[in-house]
Amino acid sequence: MPSETLWEIAKAEVEKRRSHGSEGDGAEIGEKSVFFIGSKNGGKTTIILRCLDRDESAKPTLALEYTYGRKTKGHNTPKDIAHFWELGGGTSLLDLISIPITVDTLRTFSIVLVLDLSKPNDLWSTMENLLQATKSHVDKVIMKLGKTSSKASAEMRQRMWSVVQKDHPDRELIDPFPIPLVIIGSKYDIFQDFDPEKRKVICKTLRFVAHYYGASLMFTSKSEALLLKIRGVINQLAFGIDKSKSICVDQNKPLFITAGLDSLCQIGSPPVPDSDIGKLQAHSPMELWKKVYDKLFPPKSTGTLKAVQDPARDPQYAESEVDEMRVQKDQELEHYKRSSSKTWKQIELDS
């Protein structure tokens, strides 16, 4: 009997993985993926490069970027592979969120939301838009997964509650994100010079949001010590390395709070006088915190959040043949516009 061909072996391996995946036995299936979303120019690429030990300068992310990393857990063992995705453009490209998050990748997927602490007026809208868009898509994928494997879907929903202990006093008051979520506040070196009261509001607000979604929260900057902490957290998501149990809730220091270790009691109420809380009409705790935050940091108009640069003119994406053809077509278009304008003017004169 002839030996199996490489193609037959590969086909059998794919079918084997599919059969294991449909069983939904709760095992860690496949290679892990980490999706970085967040503020435009917030430092997402820098964090990824640091986690992968790549000594290269960060370039602006145009749309959706992909890279991967490998790590060996032990001697003579195959390297684990992790996939890193990054969404550029802040909140301007929300439709691209659906590309990397699929039924096949969902169970090994994590989200890292990077927020620029130096721009507090953009912070809430960036966070809200990205988390809502991501959660909406993930919920749809979970429903789709449930149609093929109800057990796998149920295990996913059970797993999202695993970050909160069963006896946690806030268990009935929070709504964990459907997949692991880490919120990183970047540019702490600028943030630490803010007015203490402003720092207090931002810290308490982010602590509430992170706790409500069952997420980890940490601040970082160019400091090597902080970057090493962040690297450890990302490695845990990407390669399953032991999770840190350290915690720092002092608003005068970089926050570092692992999911499930905070509480509403420790966070306290929104930083607003009790007499004003009744005036803020809110239908949920999240809405109340938003109103309090927006009062101190009014969101900028949508127009100021949009990218003003034209990526087609960015020199790092130059393609001589394409650019020459683009110039030619632009000239032809201008010529057509002028010709059309003259034609319409002539028609108006004749009439």
Swiss-Prot record:
Which UniProt keywords are given for this protein, alphabetically ordered? Cell projection, Cilium, Cilium biogenesis/degradation, Cytoplasm, Cytoskeleton, Developmental protein, Dynein, Microtubule, Motor protein
Phenotype on disruption: Death before 11.5 dpc with defects in notochord and floor plate formation and a reduction of definitive endoderm. Mice also display anterior truncations of the forebrain, defects in the ventral body wall, in closure of the neural tube, and either an arrest of embryonic turning and heart looping or a randomization in their direction.
GO cellular component terms? apical part of cell; axoneme; centrosome; ciliary basal body; ciliary transition zone; cytoplasm; cytoplasmic dynein complex; cytosol
Q: Where is this region: Disordered?
A: 303-335
Q: Where does the record say this protein resides? A: Cytoplasm; Cell projection, Cilium; Cytoplasm, Cytoskeleton, Cilium basal body; Cytoplasm, Cytoskeleton, Cilium axoneme
- Name one matching Pfam family: DLIC
Molecular-function annotations in GO: dynein heavy chain binding
InterPro entries per record: DYNC2LI1 (IPR040045), Dynein_light_int_chain (IPR022780), P-loop_NTPase (IPR027417)
- On whether Ligase is a keyword of this UniProt record, the answer is no
Query: Which intervals carry biased composition (Basic and acidic residues)?
Result: 323-335
Query: What tissues contain this protein?
Result: Specifically expressed by ciliated cells in brain, lung, spleen, testis and kidney (at protein level). Enriched in the ependymal layer lining the lateral ventricles (at protein level).
The GO biological-process annotations, alphabetized, read as: cilium assembly; determination of left/right symmetry; intraciliary retrograde transport; intraciliary transport involved in cilium assembly; regulation of cilium assembly
Q: What is its main location?
A: cytoplasm
Say which domain of life the source belongs to: Eukaryota
Q: Where are the transmembrane segments?
A: none
Function text: Acts as one of several non-catalytic accessory components of the cytoplasmic dynein 2 complex (dynein-2 complex), a motor protein complex that drives the movement of cargos along microtubules within cilia and flagella in concert with the intraflagellar transport (IFT) system, facilitating the assembly of these organelles. Involved in the regulation of ciliary length.
Q: How does it assemble?
A: Light intermediate chain of the cytoplasmic dynein complex 2, a multisubunit complex composed at least of eleven different proteins. The cytoplasmic dynein 2 complex consists of two catalytic heavy chains (HCs) and a number of non-catalytic subunits presented by intermediate chains (ICs), light intermediate chains (LICs) and light chains (LCs).
PANTHER family, A to Z: CYTOPLASMIC DYNEIN 2 LIGHT INTERMEDIATE CHAIN 1, DYNEIN 2 LIGHT INTERMEDIATE CHAIN, ISOFORM 2
What family does the entry list?
Answer: Belongs to the dynein light intermediate chain family.
Q: What is the name listed in the Swiss-Prot or TrEMBL entry for this protein?
A: Cytoplasmic dynein 2 light intermediate chain 1
